[in-house]
Curated annotation (Swiss-Prot):
Gene name for this UniProt entry: NUF2
Record-stated family: Belongs to the NUF2 family.
Record's keyword terms, sorted: Cell cycle, Cell division, Centromere, Chromosome, Coiled coil, Kinetochore, Mitosis, Nucleus
Native organism taxonomy: Eukaryota, Fungi, Dikarya, Ascomycota, Saccharomycotina
Protein name (record): Probable kinetochore protein NUF2
Role description: Acts as a component of the essential kinetochore-associated NDC80 complex, which is required for chromosome segregation and spindle checkpoint activity.
Gene Ontology cellular-component annotations: Ndc80 complex; nucleus
Length: 451
């Protein structure tokens, strides 16, 4: 974000403002793609217009150059142009610093950038607008300054006249014949007194001149401060004018309408707060029931995870038995009877484990069935009555669209819960059938292997 105190103007507005200030060189094409020669010429015109100093006249003055230097160096065109560009850069830096741009440098003259040139010219336009707006306020300061300058010129005239008188008396003072030493001393004393008075007058003039410069700086600072204060006061005045033009009868009527509307809204707010409290009680009851349902579903999910784990163990055991069967076939095909006995013992152990696992599986199935029946009874005996009581309480308290939405969500939860129960029953039945088929298949395979 830019930290400048003036706005960055668009090219069209910038060109219009500069041309209105008699800067005929201000063209959009030249500003968008500035060259070194173009910006130097344009800045010279700006300095000449606003500072009253022509850079070409100032830089062409031979007194600006060092007379003690070499004549060859002074007559070198490159040296002369360099000094002129440096002097122009110094003048432009001081001017742009006074109007709010403190980073002007030599690159803005030699290799100008379109964005920086646009920024510098925006500062010039802003200064021109401010100067035009505040020119009337400066009239009294300019008149006072002119008066002080006239007094200063009068003092300098008096000083020059006294200096001429001193020089005249110095030339006339000569030793004349017949004059005594005492007469010369008296004349010298008289001249010393006049010189002392002149020195005092000179010091007074210097003090007055310094006071004038300080007063001038103070007045310029006050002018700038008063200008900003005037802008702020004008803004405040415009706001107060808007308020002063307001119709008080209409304002009182609007206040009465707003008061009536406020009372109505307050009544509606109280009714809504009562409904909100009742709805919060119903929501707390519903959340309690939801947590209980979540606990039931969590128990069912835990049982399903255990069943899946057992099924995975059975699948692993099946894989092991298939591997054992394959190894057994390899041993039988090789005719090694010793390995046959070892495998027979392993097979017996696997049968024992299988029978034991079958018993545990059946016991777990019975336990899961009992748990499921218990959960169903708890749901029927505890959850359903609470849900019905909550439904009756909600229907009695509030009969709006929000409660109907909650009824619909509760019915959806019931259906989802019933669907999950049916899915669990189906999964248990499928798991039992798979286990039974697997056990029968394993027994058949073992019988075939032993036979």
């Amino acid at each position: 974000m830019s930290k400048d105190v003036f706005p960055l103007l668009e090219l069209s507005e910038l060109v219009t403002c500069l041309q209105s200030c008699d800067f005929s060189l201000a063209v959009e094409e030249n500003i968008s793609k500035p060259s070194s020669q173009y910006v130097i010429t344009l800045y010279k015109q700006i300095i000449d217009t606003f500072m009253g100093v022509s850079p070409d006249t100032l830089l062409s003055n031979e007194a600006l150059f060092d007379n003690s230097g070499s004549n060859d160096i002074q007559q070198n065109p490159a040296y002369t142009e360099t000094v002129k560009v440096l002097a122009l850069n110094k003048i432009c830096f001081k001017f742009f610093q006074d109007i709010g741009v403190s980073d002007f440098n030599m690159m803005d003259l030699y290799k100008p950038d379109s964005l920086r040139t646009r920024r510098l010219l925006s500062a010039v336009v802003n200064y021109a607008r401010f100067r035009e707006e505040r020119m009337f306020d400066c009239d009294k300061f300019m008149s006072k300054t002119e008066f002080l300058l006239n007094q200063l010129r009068s003092k300098f005239d008096d000083y020059n006249y006294l200096q001429q008188q001193i020089n005249k008396h110095r030339n006339e003072i000569e030793l004349r014949e017949g004059e005594t030493f005492e007469t010369l001393q008296q004349q010298n004393k008289h001249l010393d007194q006049q010189i002392s008075r002149l020195k005092g007058l000179q010091e007074t003039l210097n003090i007055d001149y310094n006071a004038y410069k300080s007063r001038k700086q103070s007045l310029l600072h006050d002018l700038e401060k008063f200008g900003f204060e005037l802008i702020e006061l004008e803004f405040e005045r415009n706001k107060l004018e808007k308020h002063s033009k307001t119709d008080f009868n209409e304002l009182n009527l609007n206040i009465e309408k707003l008061s009536t509307l406020l009372a109505t809204q307050q009544t509606n707010l109280n009714n809504l707060e009562q409904k909100h409290r009742k709805l919060r009680i119903s929501m707390n009851t519903f959340q309690t029931l939801t947590h209980e349902l979540y606990d039931v579903l969590q128990l069912i999910s835990t049982d399903l995870q255990e069943s899946h784990l057992r099924e995975a163990n059975l699948i692993d055991m099946r894989e092991q038995l298939l591997q054992t069967d394959q190894k057994l076939n390899n041993i039988l095909s090789s005719g090694v009877m010793v390995k046959m006995k070892i495998l027979q013992s392993q097979l017996d152990n696997q049968k024992k484990k299988l029978h034991q696992l079958e018993g545990e599986t059946k016991a777990k199935q019975i336990e899961n069935s009992e748990t499921l029946q218990l959960l169903q009874r708890q749901y029927t005996d505890e959850v359903v009555p609470d849900l019905r009581a909550a439904e009756e309480q909600v229907e009695n308290d509030l009969a709006n669209g929000t409660i109907k939405n909650y009824d619909y969500e509760i019915s959806q939860l019931k259906q989802a819960f019933q669907t999950e129960i049916d899915a669990i029953d189906l999964e248990y039945s499928l798991l039992s059938s798979h286990i039974n088929r697997y056990m029968e298949e394993m027994l058949r395979v073992m019988v075939e292997v032993t036979s």
